[in-house]
């Protein structure tokens, strides 16, 4: 579901605290999230560089909102599930905790060991096999678990 022009304008107005038609570039991630997008930290840093100024206007927000590389949580969920399914040759719906830890700390928008430790406190790891349901993991991440890279 896309945000309407009115919703984008309303969002911009909320972040434009002094009504000067400008919003701090530091708020770009929060703006996009409030409009239903889910930019990664890397996305946000790239957008800040692209904007190239300390502030942005409504037209910049509209342009950025339309970018296809800024995913919704549902799009991110599908992509993550597809990636885990590709790794799951046996089709069990699980990944070993040690393998997951390795992936999360070394690939893509990787996480710190401390962030992975926090995540592991939130997910269920089978005490017998050490396996993690990747569907449950993805739901935890997409539902708003505050990880820097996601």
Swiss-Prot record:
One of its GO terms (cellular component) is myosin II complex. It comes from the Eukaryota. It comes from Dictyostelium discoideum. Myosin is a hexamer of 2 heavy chains and 4 light chains (two regulatory light chains and two essential light chains). The lineage of its organism: Eukaryota, Amoebozoa, Evosea, Eumycetozoa, Dictyostelia. The keyword Repeat applies. Pfam families: EF-hand_6, EF-hand_7. This is Myosin, essential light chain. The keyword Oxidoreductase does not apply. Residues 3-38, 75-110 form the EF-hand domain. Keywords: Calcium, Metal-binding, Motor protein, Myosin, Repeat. One of its GO terms (biological process) is sorocarp development. One of its GO terms (molecular function) is calcium ion binding. Ca(2+) binds at residues 16, 18, 20, 22, 27.
